[in-house]
């Protein structure tokens, strides 16, 4: 029932009304909710430290102005978008949905985050996102990563650890991913210096 109310409020631009409703319903929410932002949808998770919970509370996408700025910068279909630390797809989902001719590459070492991203890709029927369960850095190496949410402020705060705790993960560079054909620039004369060292 609350999901239907939320989507009604989004469609009719009544986000402020939800601030009151959320204070009541937040205690009863247990399952993920589909939020329909008309041109794309997100699963939002109501658990306290889930980053996507912010969307349930505010009925807006995360960092909407930044997402819109990126979308407006994409002028042709030869563009690729690289989302490092993609989490549930806050940037990638709207960009891939609204610019469905470009290639979107998502990187996140968190299996939990990638599962949420995969669910959102499927929910939107998106075909132009490729995702990788790796960290991105200057050099290829292994590192440790802990995505136990109890250790962080929220699910958007996960980070690679300098300590020897958590799961061992791969770190790869954008240069290496291009050279190995994992990331394929659409133009052969792409500016490699523009992404060197990432």
Language-model regions, residue ranges each:
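S-adenosyl-L-methionine
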Residues: 1-186
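Short gly/pro-enriched beta-turn/loop segments at secondary-structure junctions
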Residues: 139-140, 186-188
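Short beta-strand segments
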Residues: 133, 189-193
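Switch II (G3) loop of P-loop NTPases
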Residues: 195-197
